[in-house]
């Protein structure tokens, strides 16, 4: 028995979907514990690509129970659309395979309207939100006036809460943000349909998970976004609205920290970021464009082009520390094929001072310049490599450099988007 947490180790988009898909083979339960449909996990099975924003990636494996925990914010329309997409492809043959915790909060139309209107009003000071209502939903959750899944499936409770909330939201939307008011009748009518469809999936995730663990079943906790976007530990305010570090797996699903055995951080062989915020190793030249093109670096949720840069060990060490990572899964290593040299940032330079620790002060971080070590690239394709030993020697050396500068062992290497383009150095479920 082992319980493993998967988290992003950079600014999101690290390839968590594929790694979760690989590790699901060893799990009995797969749990999403934070975020919402601002995440996008891309899975490639054979010639078929599936993109999931809410439902755990393990859903592509028959017989694996997939749970949406209390820490997630749920857009019911997106959720039901994903179910339809999956069933059309022959997945989710048994509805019991999917569970939503009743304490998960619901994204309402006014959350999305507020999210978009705020960004428009912010202009140059915008955060770079996806506009999907994630932040405003978490705001209402923390303010203790959110609408939960359990409220949605009780019609009287839902109508009462909408009546209480909507006048205030409309006032703010109209009078301050210059938006259009929303109709109570339309919201209730639309969401009542969702409630009838959702009801069969609602259960208590915490009870189910703790029973699974007590019975010796393997649980995989699937994080979204990345550690450097954490609401507390990330590059605030250019962060997401939930806890993206490994500790969020406990608070977002209702299990204790003592049941977690391994924490695997997913990390690209280079770095990307979507939206605003500091990015010390960002490339604005032909190399940056090459990484974007070769890595197909466009958001699966928004379609926005991702910013690209060299591997940042300073940021990586921060992510390893705040999540207690026991291993790294390195993705998109094949994107670096054919490069003569590869830069690895090992420290920052700030006003003549060498910084080896990641600054939390954004005024400092914005002024930091990367200090690079050069590593020789490899000129051969990685296709066909099935073990560490069958990788080109210079690719092996790059992996060892990543381990050295991050202080964490590499346990998996992805050399392409397919399942079979994966090298496992250690299985975190093996105890």
UniProtKB/Swiss-Prot annotation:
GO terms for biological process: 'de novo' AMP biosynthetic process; IMP metabolic process. SMART domains: Adenylsucc_synt (SM00788). The gene is purA. Mg(2+) binds at residues 13, 40. Pfam families: Adenylsucc_synt (PF00709). GTP binds at residues 12-18, 40-42, 306, 332-334, 414-416. Belongs to the adenylosuccinate synthetase family. Pathway: Purine metabolism; AMP biosynthesis via de novo pathway; AMP from IMP: step 1/2. This is Adenylosuccinate synthetase. Homodimer. Substrate binds at residues 300-306.
């Amino acid at each position: 028995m082992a319980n493993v947490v998967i988290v992003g180790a950079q600014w999101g988009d690290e390839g968590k979907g594929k790694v979760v898909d690989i590790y699901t083979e060893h799990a009995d339960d797969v749990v999403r514990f934070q975020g919402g449909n601002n995440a996008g996990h891309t899975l490639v099975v054979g010639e078929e690509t599936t993109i999931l924003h809410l439902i755990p990636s393990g859903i592509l494996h028959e017989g694996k129970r997939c749970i949406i925990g209390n820490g997630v914010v749920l857009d019911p329309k997106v959720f039901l659309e994903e179910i339809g997409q999956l069933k059309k492809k022959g997945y989710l043959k048994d509805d019991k395979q999917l569970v939503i915790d009743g304490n998960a909060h619901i994204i309402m139309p006014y959350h999305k309207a507020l999210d978009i209107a705020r960004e428009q009003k912010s202009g140059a000071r915008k955060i770079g939100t996806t506009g999907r209502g994630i932040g405003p939903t978490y705001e209402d959750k923390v303010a203790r006036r959110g609408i939960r899944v359990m409220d949605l499936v009780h019609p009287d409770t839902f109508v009462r809460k909408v009546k209480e909330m909507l006048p205030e939201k409309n006032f703010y939307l109209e009078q301050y943000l210059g938006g259009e008011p929303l109709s109570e009748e339309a919201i209730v009518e639309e969401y009542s349909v969702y409630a009838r469809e959702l009801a069969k999936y609602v259960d208590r995730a915490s009870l189910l998970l703790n029973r699974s663990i007590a019975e010796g079943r393997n649980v995989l906790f699937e994080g979204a976004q990345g550690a450097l976007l954490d609401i507390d530990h990330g590059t605030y305010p250019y962060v997401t609205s939930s806890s993206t570090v490994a500790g969020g797996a406990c608070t977002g699903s209702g299990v204790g920290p003592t049941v977690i055995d391994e924490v695997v951080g997913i990390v690209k062989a280079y770095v990307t970021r979507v939206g605003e915020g500091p990015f010390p190793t960002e490339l604005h030249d032909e190399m940056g464009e090459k990484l974007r093109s070769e890595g197909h670096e466009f958001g699966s949720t928004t379609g926005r082009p991702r910013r690209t840069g060299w591997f940042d060990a300073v940021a990586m060490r921060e992510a390893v520390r705040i999540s207690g990572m026991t291993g790294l899964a390195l993705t998109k290593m094949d994107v670096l094929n054919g490069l003569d040299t590869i830069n690895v940032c090992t420290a920052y330079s700030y006003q003549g001072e060498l910084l080896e620790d990641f600054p939390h002060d954004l005024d400092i971080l914005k002024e930091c310049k990367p200090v690079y070590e050069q590593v020789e690239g490899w000129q051969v394709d990685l296709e066909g490599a099935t073990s560490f030993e069958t990788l080109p020697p210079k690719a092996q050396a790059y992996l060892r450099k990543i381990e050295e500068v991050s202080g964490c062992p590499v346990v998996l290497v992805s050399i392409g988007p397919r399942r079979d383009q994966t090298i496992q150095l250690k299985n975190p479920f093996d105890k």
